[in-house]
Amino acid sequence: LIEEALLGNSDVAFAGAIGQPDAHAGELPCVYVELIEGASATEAELLEYCLQNVPERAAQPKHVEIMPELPKTAVGKVFKPDLRKKAITRVYDAALDEAGLSARVQTVVDDKKRGLVAQVSSDNSDDEISAVLGGFSRPWERGV
């Protein structure tokens, strides 16, 4: 729904919509965009475009990010696992920063049992980090 709407914008070459972690809702929609060469659309303009063109309110993205190039599969489709990792890193780092912790996501790994897991590096205690990240549906662990 989000991708189809954005692809109607003449500045958008590719769009990849995913659910980004949210401590209250579980996940919220967000979208990563690759513009056509020479396009000048801004993230704010694309977010407004989505508000006008994505009819379902729950599907309207809460975050739009323009990337120089979206990750793609061998057949040219947007590779969403990399976008999910990027969103987890962005959301978790923002939450940790807002809480005043020095902890940051080092990487996000794909665990066969738990799915995507954020690996966090920090001098902060596990309890301090859990107080911030414990409300998110995606797990975290201390990085190596």
PLM features: what roles do these ranges have?
Residues 126-136:
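Extended Gly/Ser/Thr-rich low-complexity repeat segments
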Residues 56-66, 101-102, 134-144:
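Conserved short beta-strand edge segments in small beta-sheet-based binding/regulatory domains
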Residues 1-59, 68-69, 76, 81-124, ...:
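AMP-binding/adenylate-forming catalytic core of the ANL superfamily
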